[in-house]
Amino acid sequence: MRLTPNYDYEVSSINKKKRGYIVQIIGPVLDVAFSPGMMPSIYNALVVQGRHNQEPNVTCEVQQLLGNNRVRAVAMSDTDGLMRGMEVIDTGTPISVPVGGSTLGRIFNVLGEPVDQLGPVETNQLSPIHRSAPPFLKLDTRLSIFETGIKVVDLLAPYRRGGKVGLFGGAGVGKTVLIMELINNIAKAYGGVSVFGGVGERTREGNDLYMEMKESGVINQQKLDESKVALVYGQMNEPPGARMRVGLTALTMAEYFRDVNRQDVLLFIDNIFRFVQAGSEVSALLGRMPSAVGYQPTLSTEMGSLQERITSTKEGSITSIQAVYVPADDLTDPAPATTFAHLDATTVLSRSLAAKGIYPAVDPLDSTSMMLQPQIVGEQHYKTAQRVKQTLQRYKELQDIIAILGLDELSDDDRLTVARARKIERFLSQPFFVAEIFTGSPGKYVSLAETIRGCTLILSGEFDDLPEQAFYLVGTIDEVNAKAMLEEEKNFTK
């Protein structure tokens, strides 16, 4: 029988707990002996009691029951200073983390402890990180578009409400800015919130993201309850147990906003490959036989237990955007291959577009979405998207000829195609709200209907007489005329 999750999760007093002692320590793995009949359950949190009545200092999670009243647990923090014989307390529950509005604007570790030096989190609501996926009867199976207000995404690779999106992009192509704009737009358009799970990435990147979020207003440090995001970090310097579970901590916080607050939630996981990598390390430490390419034999199960909890229910939705690192650019590697099976859309960021100064640098030809079907998005959206892709594809094919022979050697039709493709390419750029402080241009949220209308007018030749620069970094197509007239006036006054 599936139990309804309880968010007022009470962690009982530590003195009433079952007690054991450490018998073996191998790196981040502890073997703990308990009295007969006092064994903890799988996934229970164990706390190593410090010597001389000090505070408990290391939390572990039970992974295996070994027999002879012993369990094997994986530590969530460094095991430096632990010794055989130290007392271990079974908390009687899985790792439980704070949930609710008080988590917004704060940074947490895998245990739900704030690490931003802003004091304790004021909440009594805790939730265990291990839960079942929502039952089928509670799922919302309607296929609906999750409008982001970002033109290139909504038109060519739309996100599914409650779906999963893979975000592919190297360093310096605008991944962080795109993530922050999505966080900002979901808060404005849907009254939703976001949870960011930093899984096994660099500490410096996590710090930079936090600073940029404060600068752009996504995190309001004066009024934390007005912040739009909660951050959960398990960086690459932390033990594999923490990196393996930090994604579940972030997901648990997101589930509360969906199930209790009935909100639409954006869940960012950066990087989903590191989740698999940490699971592989833990699997080896526990002595399991490795599977293909050295990965854990439970790879599909672990990925499924995380991904199946990310879904839409009748209360709200969790839409997940997951950065995917592809080792050695090998898409057949078991880690990315297992991830792809769960994705509804892919957003690919292009370095060549970023080099041209076109932001967001989303590649319109490489980005894909299962939602781009006429029976889901409608005939007009589908046909416009296909015509845009065909025009951009033809432009891509002609680029080599243009580079060698020049534009004058093309036929009239091809010259017209190139001109319209360059205008579409620039029209799909957009000023972001979170980049206002850097660019000085006010951000634009563009509805899907306006994006379709704009691209249709460009393709039909309505704007063939306007310079392509007028299409750069505008919101709706109506702004193009105004920008062109302004440029004309400037040139005239010169």
Curated annotation (Swiss-Prot):
Keywords: ATP synthesis, ATP-binding, CF(1), Hydrogen ion transport, Ion transport, Membrane, Nucleotide-binding, Plastid, Thylakoid, Translocase, Transport. The gene is atpB. GO terms for cellular component: chloroplast thylakoid membrane; mitochondrion; proton-transporting ATP synthase complex. This is ATP synthase subunit beta, plastid. Transmembrane segments: none annotated. F-type ATPases have 2 components, CF(1) - the catalytic core - and CF(0) - the membrane proton channel. CF(1) has five subunits: alpha(3), beta(3), gamma(1), delta(1), epsilon(1). CF(0) has four main subunits: a(1), b(1), b'(1) and c(9-12). Produces ATP from ADP in the presence of a proton gradient across the membrane. The catalytic sites are hosted primarily by the beta subunits. GO terms for biological process: proton motive force-driven mitochondrial ATP synthesis. PANTHER family: ATP SYNTHASE, ATP SYNTHASE SUBUNIT BETA, MITOCHONDRIAL. The lineage of its organism: Eukaryota, Viridiplantae, Streptophyta, Embryophyta, Tracheophyta. It is a peripheral membrane protein. Belongs to the ATPase alpha/beta chains family. Its main location: plastid. It is found in: Plastid thylakoid membrane. It catalyses: ATP + H2O + 4 H(+)(in) = ADP + phosphate + 5 H(+)(out). ATP binds at G169, G170, A171, G172, V173, G174, K175, T176. Its EC number is 7.1.2.2. Pfam families: ATP-synt_ab, ATP-synt_ab_N, ATP-synt_VA_C. GO terms for molecular function: ATP binding; ATP hydrolysis activity; proton-transporting ATP synthase activity, rotational mechanism. Gene3D superfamilies: 2.40.10.170, Bovine Mitochondrial F1-atpase, Atp Synthase Beta Chain, Chain D, domain 3, P-loop containing nucleotide triphosphate hydrolases.
